Amino acid sequence: MSGKSKTYNFTSRKKSFGNYWLVYSNKTGVILKLVSDREVAHWILNLEFNPNVQTFKFDDFSTNILIDGLMHDIKYRALVQYSCGLEYQFISVEKNDLAKSREKSIDAALWRATHIKFRHISDEDLVPRRHHVFPLLRLSAFLTANKDQFISPGLIDGVDAYIGKMRRGIVAKYLTDMGDFSKSALMLQLYRLYNSGVIALSFVETPFMYGSLWELRHE
């Protein structure tokens, strides 16, 4: 994809990439300043609901690393703490053969020196899942709008016991089986568990469909 690609690849807004976004991350509890639609796509697809991501930051970061005897200034946009370690992430439109070779060199040198990984994210990594961008953005907006919503300890304990016993199922059955509580509170708690990585949630069009599948993650 070229730099003139349209946002409909991710957002269907028919405008050129480069929009500036302020978004709230429920995972990190901070407002993110994202400088393009592809950063939004990367955040919502790969970070916000990724159970292996503990926390992350976006900024204009840089670090110096020695590669083949020469010092290089490496720039990157995201600093991501996975459960298995830290990774610096550079984000751009495309990744040609030269960029792929550079990515491998930086990753190897950075790992040897600091045990930190390096990854180059491009459109080819994002486009295959672009249809999930808007559904996940809507889910994130729902969680943000309800981030201060009180949920009773009884419901929380009940849901924890239910998912621990059932381990997987369809959202509709979960709502039926837990019918002593309000559907809106049950859905909010389920989505909070998805956002925090306790459960996985599989959906085709939108996570708000009662036919969506949930599954307790194995730690």
Q: Can you annotate each of these PLM segments?
A:
Residues 1-219:
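Electrostatic, structured charged patches in enzyme active sites and in nucleic-acid/phosphate-binding
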